Design a protein with these regions (language model features):
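Polysaccharide-binding and catalytic clefts of secreted carbohydrate-active enzymes
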Residues: 1-113
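Hydrophobic targeting/anchoring helices
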Residues: 60, 64-184
Length: 184
């Protein structure tokens, strides 16, 4: 164990379970990577357990999907570091994704394409956009026609659906100014 994880270096050797270091914020990247792998396996097992329950009760014409999210900067981009999406999606019938992208002059198309390519590769088939923004806060407000452009971009990248968060605008709480498809 000490040899495999390089714990002999910098006097990190573990001789007793009571000496085992806290992996949060550890300087030992081998140990940190193994712990992250363990955490991702828990997500996969949990989703598989849920899918098994649904599979037991669903009809033959129904499918199982999961809203796989992506890492976030100011929008969705790149792999979700806390989930092994490829492993976790094996128990799903159809891949689902949650893609948020900037609007107005900030929209490049890269966010839709990168996340769409990842989503399509999960099951090597088309996928579902289970959540994306209809309208947003002031910096996210789309130009006229831009929502249609974004929807067509999702479909062109392999999505069989474009579902919006929210249908109607929120009237209270933290997302009061996050607008829906119906802006009332």
């Amino acid at each position: 164990f000490n040899h495999e994880f390089g714990l002999d270096y910098w006097s990190n050797r573990v001789n007793d379970w009571d000496d085992f270091p806290d992996v949060r914020g550890t300087i030992n990247q081998s140990l940190a990577a193994e712990f992250c792998k363990f955490q991702r396996s828990l997500v996969t097992k949990f989703l598989s357990w849920q899918a098994d329950i649904v599979r037991e009760y669903k009809r033959d014409d129904q499918f199982i999907t999961q809203n796989f999210d992506f890492d976030w900067t100011t929008h969705s981009i790149g792999y979700q570091s806390q989930v092994d999406q490829y492993d976790a999606s094996r128990c799903m019938t159809v891949a689902g994704a949650d893609i948020y992208h900037p609007s107005n002059e900030e929209l490049t198309g890269a966010e839709i394409t990168v996340c769409g390519n990842i989503s399509r590769s999960l099951k090597k088939d088309n996928y579902l956009i289970l959540e994306t923004e209809a309208q947003g806060l002031t910096p996210w407000l789309p130009y006229p026609g831009q929502l249609r452009l974004q929807a067509y971009s999702h479909i062109a990248n392999g999505s069989n659906s474009v579902m919006y968060w929210h249908w109607h605008s929120i009237h209270n709480a933290i997302e009061s100014y996050w607008k829906g498809v119906l802006s009332h």
